[in-house]
Design a protein with these regions (language model features):
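Conserved, mostly hydrophobic/aromatic
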Residues: 10, 29, 97, 155, ...
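An N-terminally biased module of ancient metal coordination in phosphate/nucleic-acid-related enzymes
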Residues: 1-85, 91, 95, 160-162, ...
Length: 270
């Protein structure tokens, strides 16, 4: 089995919006024969109910470091954070960061892009055009990648979460693909690994991972690197969709993926 299937560094626990404790997630990883497991709690953001509060972040860091010591020699544990592009960066050191866009600024308001279909429809009405909305999202991604110290670009086409039926916008339209590809190009230029994220599959929103096949093709053409994650919010689904994601990567011509270990990224054959 490829090592890419025995690691996940995008996980959420009871310290933010996850259902499982960190130790429950560790035990699930051990049962699956994992080589590494990363915790990526949502970094503090006053506008985001899913984010860790400052006091919770202190407790989160303490607990992950405790588990790292307790399970030393059994599993490599990494202390990470998922950073939202509109929030400040943490004062604490982390082993790695995932850079994600969950919110857009528009006319003085913050709009959450992954809350619900009804909210997405309302956002599109505010922008007056679905492609203007998508362009604003991808431009926010590109700007974030340009300045971010992160290692990983999170769920790059999250804006498509509620477009499973393709009725909100056409993901093959150049007005969608153009800005998406520009964001991908910035991620690759800045050296970020692009996660292939099965989280929306686990929660029933999409039949395929982020990013969509057309964007994976662009990523391969650009020479970008991928890392497989499940965006896990429930330890029971730690590798949900991994087999399908692996098949998709192979079909799109990827021969290797990255695995994040204690010493940094390693490239592994698919």
């Amino acid at each position: 089995m490829t090592e890419a299937l025995r690691s996940c560094v995008h996980t959420h626990t009871t310290f933010c919006d996850g259902a499982s404790t960190p130790e429950e997630t560790v035990r699930a990883a051990l049962a699956l024969g994992f080589v590494s497991l990363g915790f990526s709690g949502h970094g503090a953001a006053a506008y985001d109910d899913a984010a860790m509060r400052p006091e919770a972040e202190v407790q989160y860091r303490r607990e992950i470091l405790r588990l790292r010591a307790a399970y030393a020699g059994q599993l490599e544990l990494l202390l990470g954070q998922e950073h939202d592009a509109l929030s400040p960066y943490a004062d604490y050191p982390y082993d790695y960061l995932i850079e994600s866009v969950h919110y857009l600024r528009h006319q003085g308001d913050l709009l959450c892009v992954d809350l619900s279909r009804a909210d997405t429809e309302a956002h599109i009405r505010r922008f007056g055009d679905p492609y203007a909305y998508c362009r604003a999202y991808f431009e926010t991604c590109a700007a974030a990648y340009e300045k971010s110290p992160a290692n990983i670009a999170g769920h790059l086409d999250l804006v498509s979460k509620f477009n499973g039926a393709g009725d909100l916008f056409d993901e093959a339209d150049p007005r969608y693909l153009g800005p998406a590809r520009e964001a991908l190009a910035v991620a690759v230029e800045r050296g970020l690994a692009v996660e292939v994220n099965t989280g929306a599959m686990a929660r029933g929103y999409r039949p395929i991972p982020y990013p969509a096949p057309a964007l994976l093709r662009t990523l391969r053409e650009l020479g970008g690197r991928v890392i497989l994650t499940s965006d896990c919010h429930d330890a029971a689904r730690l590798t949900y969709g991994y087999a399908e994601a692996l098949a998709l990567l192979r079909a799109e011509g990827f021969r290797t993926a990255l695995v994040l270990r204690a010493g940094g990224f390693r490239e592994t054959a698919l």
